Amino acid sequence: MAVFTAVSNADLALWMRHYDLGDVVAFRGIPSGIENSNFFLTTTRGEYVLTIFENLTAGQLPFYVDLMSHLAKHGVPVPAPVARDDGTLFGELHGKPAAIVTKLEGAAQLAPGVEHCVEVGQMLARMHLAGRDYPRHQPNLRSLPWWRDTVPAIAPFVTGEQRALLEGELAHQAAFFASDDYAALPEGPCHCDLFRDNALFAHAEPDTGHSVRLGGFFDFYFAGCDKWLFDVAVTVNDWCVDLPTGALDAARADALLRAYQTVRPFTAGERRHWGDMLRAGAYRFWVSRLYDFHLPRAAQMLKPHDPGHFERILRERIAHAGALPETHACN
């Protein structure tokens, strides 16, 4: 989340006339992230987040806001879009689509432990199952077609060794995506960006036996229909990584994956291709971070991420694929 489009007090006052949310108490931009303009909004009715969509069109947006509504109605803790006075879930601000959603409880855990990974794994599986009957379809817009379009644009900015890795991994993933095994993998709506800063944790209730409690997942604006295993791989590559080296932390990865499969057991095909999908998850973010770093957009509060982090992760996943835990295997 970042701020590309500024919103004045006068802009906000006009915008809020379309909502029954009381009077504005506080309003400030959110500096983290790189895709949309985001603001914390506090009113006399509660706390919310206002998002102005910098790339998604009004035609694309219903997939995302309706998905959050669908998941919230199925008991998954996600931000719920707030309806406007005409019943719609988004409008237009400065000529761009914009929406208000509820603000989740809790704070991000940027140094997660095993207990946090257990909570994330279980809820990710619940989210996947809750999305099975979601009627809209939107492909993951940062998948293979986007990689093919983007790699030539970033190639002039990287070393020869990096270019060889970019092109070699693209060929590997293209062959994987074209396989019958890939086609058979379970799929549905995915978050596609479930990093540790896109989940919140609140204090656990007394006498529950839990040391932490997941407040919820947010920032669904990279979501799309994809293989569930890709969503798991993206999540593991962030929540279970040793930051200096990019290697997987075995204890955290095992905890997250075992927790996930207590809700949705992995298939035999998913087990065969776990290594390929870990590489796909790392590749997707290496490519996007290279693009954002070398071809940045103007923003008031933009903080680009280090592309080298996911280059290290990709090299580690190629060298050490790992395996899914064997408990609760199914065919």
Curated annotation (Swiss-Prot):
Pathway: Amino-acid biosynthesis; L-threonine biosynthesis; L-threonine from L-aspartate: step 4/5. The keyword tRNA processing does not apply. It is an enzyme of class 2 (transferase). GO terms for biological process: threonine biosynthetic process. One of its GO terms (molecular function) is ATP binding. It comes from the Bacteria. The keyword Nucleotide-binding applies. Its EC number is 2.7.1.39. Pfam families: APH. InterPro entries: Aminoglycoside_PTrfase, Homoserine_kinase_II, Kinase-like_dom_sf, Pseudomonas-type_ThrB. Keywords: Amino-acid biosynthesis, ATP-binding, Kinase, Nucleotide-binding, Threonine biosynthesis, Transferase. It catalyses: L-homoserine + ATP = O-phospho-L-homoserine + ADP + H(+). HAMAP family: Homoser_kinase_2. Belongs to the pseudomonas-type ThrB family. This is Homoserine kinase. It comes from Burkholderia pseudomallei (strain 1710b). The lineage of its organism: Bacteria, Pseudomonadati, Pseudomonadota, Betaproteobacteria, Burkholderiales.
